[in-house]
Each structure stands twice: as C-alpha cells, then as structure tokens.
C-alpha cells in the first residue's frame, strides 16, 4: 500500500503520522494487517449458518459447488445478503421504536426532560396517518401518533401494510410493491421472517430470498421514516444553520465532549446540560467552558438542529482522541469502533457508553434512561470535567482544519426556501428548473466510510463532477460529514464547482432565503435515518408530475458504504425505483443470479437497480448518463 493515500481529509493526514510515531493502532493499520482478506468472504460464498460448516464454494468451479446440505453459491450469497439487510433494518428500526416510545411517554407525561417542539408537524403527521387530530389536545395527538407508529412493530394482519410505508410513498409505488408481495406489515415480523427463512433447510431459491430481503429493506425504510419524523416532533424540525466541521472545532481551553452514535435522545440532553454546567467547567480551569462536538450520525443530528460543530465521520473517529484534546466521547448505538477504548488508554479521554445493549470493554458505563435523562447527562458531563483536569497538554495536537458548513436542510426547510419564490406552489420553481434543464437531476449521497476506498475522496470527486453537470445534490450520514469537513457545504463551493445553470438556481434560492449568496453546493439533510427526508422530496415531485418515483431523474450514491444498515438503505432505494451507485464491491460476486438480479433484472421489476463502480470518475459519468436517460424518458 506504499502508493495509497489513506484520506483526503487534511486533519486525518495531520494526525496519522502522530499516531504512528506514538505506536497507536488505527483502523487503517488494522485494515492493512488484515490483507489479503478472505476471498471466499469477499465473494459471499462462505456459509456459517449451521455447524456442519463452515462451507465454502469454489468460485472457479474446480472444487465444491455445494455445501454439505446442498446449498449452492446462489443460495448462500442470497442468504448472507438478506441477513445483512435484516440486521440493518433491526438497527434502524430499534432506533425508531425508541423514539416512538419516548413520544408516547411525552404524551402520557412520563418524560419530563422532553417536550413537543414542533406541534404543527405532529398534527400534520396525525393527518397523514388518518388520525383526525383537529380539536384534540396536543398530548393526545402525541399518544395517538406514537401508538399508530408502534402498530408498525406489532400488526399481525399480513394484508395490512405498515402505516409509515403506505402513507409516505406514491400510490403507484405502493400498489406495485403490494403486487410483488413485499410491502411490510410489521417491522419485527419481517425481520424475524428473514432470520427464519435463512435457517438451515429453509428457503433455497435465490430470487425468492432476495424478494424477502426487499421486504426487509422496506421494513428498514419504515423504521427510518418514523424515526426522522418523530424526532422532528420532539426535538424540532431542522432549519438552515451555519456551523463548522472537522477536528479543528476542538478547543484547547475547553472541556471537549464528543457525542457519537445515532440516537438524539441522549445527545440533545447532553447539549442542554452542558450549557448549564459551563461555570463548573470554568472553575476546573477550562477558560472556554464546555465545547460539545459531534461524530457520525449523532453529530449530524445535533448539527442539523443546533448548529453543534461536527468533528469527524465514521472512519476517522479515532482521530478525535488522538488530538489529545478530547475529554469524553459519549456513545449510544451503531458505528462505534470497539477500538476506541484501546486508543483512549493512551490519553486521558473517557469513553462513556450509555445503552444497556451497547457496552464496550474498558469503557465507563453510565446508564441512560428517558425518565432520568437529565441526571444521567449531569453525571456524564461531570466525568468529562474530571477527565479535563487530567489532560496532558504535551499530547495536545489539534489540527488547524475546519470548514464552514451550512446545514439544516430538512424537507420542510427546502420547501420553505422554495416558497420564497412561489408561496402558492413551492415545488413549481424546482420542477420548472428540472424541466428546462437548469437542474439536470437530483443525486442523494448516503452511506459510510470504508478503508477500501480513500477516505472521503469518492464523495468529493463524484460531487464535483455532478455539480459541473448541473445536478442538485443532497447528502446524509457520513457522506454529509465528508462534504462538511471538506468545504462542499459552503457558498464558495457553489461558486467554484457548480455548472452555470445550477449555480444560477442555487443563487436565486439562496438570496431568496436571505443568505446573501447561493445555497451550498451540497444540501445536508441529516443523519442516516434521515434519508427518508430525500424520499419525501422525491415523492412530492413525483406526485406533482403525476409519475412514479422510477421515472424521476433521481439517483443515489453510497461510494464508501460499509455497514449492514447501508445495505438495507441501498436496497430500499432500489426498491423505490432509484438507480443506486455503490463504490465498494459488494460481497455477492460469487453468485451470477444475485448479481444479475440486483444490477439488471431489478430495473425491469422495480425501476431501480445497483450500479457497482469503484472508480469515482467513472461512477460520476454513469450517474450522469442515468439522469440523462431518465430525462429522455420524461421527454425533457
């Protein structure tokens, strides 16, 4: 790997040599030590589902072509894939359940740390779910919405689809998915069904297995959608906010607390409590008090709603500790590296776990519960202040790297900006500019980071090329983090990289929104669960045009995808009719049936399909070609 550049993030480039000199192992070191990775696993042809195995299929056709039970490569690859989808759906949907249960507690008056911050949105959701909120007390509406959402985890009638899936998609798409038998009726049941059908001696038809995976991906979409919408009700719907990103947001003279993970229930309270405990931090010697920063999707949540600076994204989370300036990293669920505690041992940093089902050996555990949220947050901040007192100033190396980032573009915020140009028909300016070609299409960037690609590079490279081709870009998750850290969520990026017609549209919208300049080149829509915000925008456009989602000049890209959640997201994007690029070779190449289904046959069946391309320049060209193909289909 001598010619391999690990990252385009200057903060990472600054800190990696420091880590190496100190003998601190990072994700990049562990990835290199893992080479060569298992070829059977890379192809998806290793089966560990029963203890007759593990069984490995010879991809060259010379050795075993079936496992001990007789499962062939197609069955093995499909089973492995849809189990990943089930895990991803479980992760997102458990997040959603947590939010829904908290909303129920708010409605019942049992969660004093939380309140309803967006009553208007709550009533709109109630109307969407056919709950007739008019004239009802807001707490009653909260209870009814929460219970209707929780129904999506418990409904036993298989012919009644999940509320949040049925009411948020186009009618044509709902009908198509129902005809295919893949509309979920119950998130938990669908995940259970996947685990059951992939047990030894069950479903052995690759295509049938994949259809089960598609159903699981739609369950994931359901859980994500309700997570986002109900979080907005409790914490407020994001509006444009100017903040900063990258590790330069850490401060030498402050108690630095990073919130990391995915669940805003904890991080929001940490932010509140930190403000109230500023004086305690100053008494401990921190001249600037407490500085809360974000990492990963929890970071995106508080960045969108509060303007809390984003320190970094998934792959570089260890770098926050290696600065020597981080006093506490408070983690909840998902995408938290177990290695954090090992890195923290080299510094004074406290790694604080907070969820009963997510502990890490070597971390300090402070249990978080909604009914005692403030008390838990106070304990956490106190631990951070005590850690600050132990900080070794000789080890502090904060890179001088931070970028301005304009974030907070929820679907509602985008509509509010558009309404400045046409209050009676906010979508008209957007649709008119798509039809006349000023905006060629829309691209959603999502997903993770992966050391198999140069950190952040594919996001940046593809975005610059799409911008040149006048494609409007949205972003979520660690992809959004890449853009924020590398300066693509600024007005200057729009001036530098946008094609002339896209630049003109973004400038008109930015000035109308009072930004005294264009909107940023990439619009930050939130965390990974907030991919559903992009669906809301797409569905609104499709309904306005009278077409289904698979006709829109809309694409998605996850150029550095890594997690099982990303597998689920990509699958539901394809299922909704969105051509979806992935920049990491998926672990399915051992089955021609699975590859053909996901990259070709899905196009005929669903309208969406996967585009596998590891070269970001070629990926950008392919996405532009897809957008042009879709435009021709619409006759524009």
UniProtKB/Swiss-Prot annotation:
One GO BP annotation of this record: response to hydrogen peroxide
Q: Report the family membership.
A: Belongs to the Ni-containing carbon monoxide dehydrogenase family.
Q: What is its EC number?
A: 1.2.7.4
What is the organism lineage in this UniProt record?
Answer: Bacteria, Bacillati, Bacillota, Clostridia, Thermoanaerobacterales
List localization entries. Answer: Cytoplasm; Cell membrane
Binding residues annotated for [4Fe-4S] cluster 2, in chain numbering:
47, 50, 55, 69
Name the chain's protein. Carbon monoxide dehydrogenase 1
Q: Has keyword Metal-binding?
A: yes
Question: What are the recorded GO MF terms, alphabetically?
Answer: 4 iron, 4 sulfur cluster binding; anaerobic carbon-monoxide dehydrogenase activity; hydroxylamine reductase activity; nickel cation binding; peroxidase activity
The note on cofactor binding and number reads: Binds 3 [4Fe-4S] clusters per homodimer. Binds 2 [Ni-4Fe-5S] clusters per homodimer.
Domain comment quoted from the record: Cluster B is an all-cysteinyl-liganded 4Fe-4S cluster; cluster C is a mixed Ni-Fe-S cluster which is the active site of CO oxidation. Cluster D is also an all-cysteinyl-liganded 4Fe-4S cluster that bridges the two subunits of the CODH dimer.
For this UniProt record, the keywords arranged alphabetically read as follows:
4Fe-4S, Cell membrane, Cytoplasm, Iron, Iron-sulfur, Membrane, Metal-binding, Nickel, Oxidoreductase
Catalyzed reactions per annotation: CO + 2 oxidized [2Fe-2S]-[ferredoxin] + H2O = 2 reduced [2Fe-2S]-[ferredoxin] + CO2 + 2 H(+)
Q: Which PANTHER family match?
A: CARBON MONOXIDE DEHYDROGENASE, HYDROXYLAMINE REDUCTASE
Q: Which CDD domains match?
A: CODH
Q: How would you describe this protein's topology in the membrane?
A: Peripheral membrane protein
């Amino acid at each position: 790997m001598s010619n391999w550049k690990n990252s385009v993030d200057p903060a990472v480039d600054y800190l990696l040599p420091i880590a190496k000199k100190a003998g601190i192992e990072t994700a990049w070191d562990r990835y290199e030590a893992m080479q060569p990775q298992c070829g059977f696993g890379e192809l998806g042809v290793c089966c560990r589902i029963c203890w007759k195995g593990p069984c490995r299929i010879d991809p060259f056709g010379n050795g075993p072509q079936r496992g001990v039970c007789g499962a062939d490569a197609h069955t093995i690859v499909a089973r492995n894939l849809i189990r990943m989808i089930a895990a991803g759906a479980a992760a997102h949907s458990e997040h959603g359940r947590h939010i829904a249960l908290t909303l129920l507690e708010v409605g019942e008056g049992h969660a004093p740390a939380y309140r309803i911050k967006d009553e208007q949105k709550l009533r709109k959701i109630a109307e969407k779910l056919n709950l007739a909120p008019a004239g009802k007390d807001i707490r009653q509406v909260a209870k009814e919405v929460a219970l209707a959402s929780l129904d999506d985890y418990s409904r036993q009638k298989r012919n009644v689809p999940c509320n949040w899936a049925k009411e948020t998609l186009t009618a044509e798409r709902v009908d198509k998915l129902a005809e295919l038998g893949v509309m979920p009726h119950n998130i938990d049941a669908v995940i259970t069904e996947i685990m059951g059908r992939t047990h030894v001696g069950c479903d052995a038809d690759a295509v049938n297995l994949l259809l089960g995976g598609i159903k699981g991906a739609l369950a994931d979409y359901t859980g994500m959608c309700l997570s986002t919408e109900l979080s907005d009700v409790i914490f407020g719907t994001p509006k444009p906010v100017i903040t900063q990103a990258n590790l330069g947001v850490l401060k030498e003279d402050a108690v630095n607390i990073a919130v990391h993970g995915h669940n805003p229930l904890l991080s929001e309270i940490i932010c509140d409590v930190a403000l109230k405990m500023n004086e305690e931090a100053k008494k401990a010697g921190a001249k600037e008090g407490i500085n809360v920063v974000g990492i990963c999707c929890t970071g995106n949540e508080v960045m969108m709603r509060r303007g809390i600076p984003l320190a970094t994204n998934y792959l570089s989370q260890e770098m926050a500790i290696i600065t020597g300036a981080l006093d506490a990293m408070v983690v909840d669920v998902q995408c938290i590296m177990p290695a954090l505690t090992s890195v923290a041992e080299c510094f004074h940093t406290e790694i604080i776990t907070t969820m009963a089902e997510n502990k890490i050996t070597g971390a300090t555990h402070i249990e978080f519960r909604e009914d005692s949220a403030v008390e838990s947050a106070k304990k956490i901040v106190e631990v951070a202040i005590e850690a600050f007192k132990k900080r070794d100033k000789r080890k502090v190396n904060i890179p001088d790297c931070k970028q301005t980032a304009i974030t907070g573009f929820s679907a509602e915020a985008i509509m509010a900006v558009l309404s400045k140009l046409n209050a009676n028909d906010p979508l008209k300016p957007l649709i008119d500019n798509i039809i006349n070609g000023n905006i060629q299409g829309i691209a959603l960037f999502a997903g993770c980071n992966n050391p198999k690609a140069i950190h952040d590079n594919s996001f940046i490279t593809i975005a610059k090329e799409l911008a040149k081709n006048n494609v409007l870009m949205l972003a979520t998750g660690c992809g959004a983090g890449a853009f924020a850290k590398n300066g693509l969520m600024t007005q200057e990026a729009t001036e530098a990289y946008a094609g002339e017609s896209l630049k003109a549209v973004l400038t008109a919208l930015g000035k109308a929104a009072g930004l005294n300049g264009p909107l940023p080149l990439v619009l930050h829509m939130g965390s990974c669960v907030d991919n559903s915000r992009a669906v809301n925008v797409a569905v609104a456009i499709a309904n306005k045009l009278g077409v289904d989602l698979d006709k829109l000049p809309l694409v998605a890209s996850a150029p550095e995808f890594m997690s099982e959640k990303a597998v689920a997201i990509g699958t539901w994007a394809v299922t909704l009719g969105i051509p979806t690029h992935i920049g990491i070779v998926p672990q399915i190449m051992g089955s021609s049936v699975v590859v053909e289904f996901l990259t070709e046959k899905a196009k005929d069946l669903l309208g969406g399909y996967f585009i596998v391309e590891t070269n970001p320049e070629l990926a950008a060209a392919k996405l532009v070609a897809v957008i042009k193909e879709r435009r021709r289909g619409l006759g524009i």
